[in-house]
């Protein structure tokens, strides 16, 4: 994109101020800013809804532990066959940094070992290898990174020889970024040559995969299901044959792993139905009545906490791309440079960040285990 093309695009969205410092930049800075303008989707600002009225929320049934144990052998056999046939891929959402862990590195690089080095990425691979060993077939792993941690993540895997995993079955892709804007819809500038952006939420992973050209690899491998999971949980089973088998056996469009809450007020989102379709209600949205509501067995009705571990059918995901997921905006503190080019770090929220949520993906599908 050249300068004139950038001006025209910015005029379309009333964002001409992005080029305010253009003449002060060196050639590299000008090139990078024009490139960012070209790839930035300014339409998200107009698309986004704040909160929005939820539909009718109701409890959802889940497969209980006794039911799982009863069908474990049968479900496990179905799941292993699907893995062995190459029909299952895994998607690791690893775009975050380890800031809350006291680290400036990608979260997956954090060392959780006590007597020896054990990295979060290492545990993910070790968990996945359990199923690989059982099935005799490598599972294609897609690792989602972000602009801030992509190079560090890729290099970390290389330096550790992919923790023993076949590198041909690991593909990296970057999460899309969304512009951050003030309350009037004007995007902030992080620097004179850089628009302020943030990751586009946990619902944007599949679109980011598509934009990265990974659909060809999915087709080549014959992958029909994708197990999506977050980097945070080092104890979770990945590509769990029993989970896969139960979803396939029931003919569901998506499966969600859940855990019973330790108490009604535990701060975790829960699976539910919304207007009769599967959905998720965040803990801040749960009313006192919902927190204390019980089912016919005397159990808490909204009791199935989500852990961000889902199994999606690929062909249904492709259908979602045609419908487009909504964007949601939330007020945040966004560092920026002012009209004088001075850096400002606000003490209070000063604008919106824009995200797509995985709950919208689930709600667009008709059935969930």
Regions found by a protein language model. Give the residues of each.
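Conserved beta-loop-beta/alpha segment of the NTase-like Rossmann-fold superfamily
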Residues: 162, 167-266
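N-terminal glycine-rich phosphate-binding loop and ensuing alpha1 helix
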Residues: 3-171, 179, 189-206, 214-215, ...
